[in-house]
């Protein structure tokens, strides 16, 4: 992993297997399949990057997937997320367009059965995910509950995009930023999908235990901060940096609005500290939940409960690994690529521009 992330503390059991066999062949297979379905353009570099990101994220987020059907669900929900994010992020003409949101809500309301004559790319992926996950979950009541919970989470995610994009117009407020970000990052529906893959007979009411809910709140915030570190370079190059958490910290701490090695170092260390506190809190909840339910459940139920907890935690570890291995955040022309690889020695080379706060 890049040394930029060496000070982030993750328990080992949160990290999924890093080696991905036949990775390039899997990417090629999925890109060809979705070109044939009309989701991708075979000549589009953007589509190739999104396909690569979706394959890798499905592998690292959903390492609990047991078969191609579950891997496909992971791919589709991630591709739907990426394409929806690209459609709305930093584009007020889209996130202020009520019709664009209503089309998505119509797809969800009708569970993928829509009468539109044409679809945006993000709508195609969402429809495919909804139809396939409904079929996947139909014979298990727990999975059906999660199927609907994920759709609710997708509504919350889409509704958060407008407020999140408006944050750049207001002074930095850490509490508000992280509150919106826990929805905007789409962690919760992704996590519920991972749990859907492992839950069978466990009483699903356990997922509404206060400690379980608080653990997920910490995990969602932690994931959003790690994602902001991963995406800093991409958002800088795209001109969409002003809502990045690291940017906000640097901006708040600089009266002269300069972007130098010192301010960057302070900002990164604060995020490391925030992430580590959140991870430690989540790990404490994990331990407390396991201790509590080991006394309440029989051996078979407890084994399933541990799988549910693990599926949640692997999302965060998978996000840490994924962001360091995909083209979406690691482009060759990135002004921060060397910074990621060799933090202390390279930061003075690149972090010497005032245009960041223009």
Curated annotation (Swiss-Prot):
Q: Please give the InterPro entries that the UniProt record associates with this protein.
A: Isoprenoid_synthase_dom_sf, Terpene_cyclase-like_2
Reactions it catalyzes:
(2E,6E)-farnesyl diphosphate = (1S,2S,4R)-beta-elemene + diphosphate; (2E,6E)-farnesyl diphosphate = (+)-valencene + diphosphate; (2E,6E)-farnesyl diphosphate = alpha-selinene + diphosphate; (2E,6E)-farnesyl diphosphate = (-)-7-epi-alpha-selinene + diphosphate
Query: So what EC number does this one have?
Result: 4.2.3.-, 4.2.3.198, 4.2.3.73, 4.2.3.86
Membrane-spanning parts: none
Give a yes or no for keyword Lyase in this entry. Answer: yes
Top-rank EC class of the record's enzyme: lyase
In which residues does the motif DDxx(x)D/E motif occur? 84-89
Q: What Pfam families does the record point to?
A: Terpene_syn_C_2
Q: Where is this motif: NDxxSxxxD/E motif?
A: 227-235
Sorted alphabetically, the keyword list is:
Lyase, Metal-binding
Family, per the entry?
A: Belongs to the terpene synthase family.
* Entry text on domains: Contains several highly conserved motifs that are important for catalytic activity including the aspartate-rich 'DDxx(x)D/E' motif and the 'NDxxSxxxD/E' motif, both of which are involved in complexing metal ions to coordinate the binding of the isoprenyl diphosphate substrate in the active site.
Protein's recorded name: Terpene synthase 12
Q: Which gene encodes it?
A: TPS12
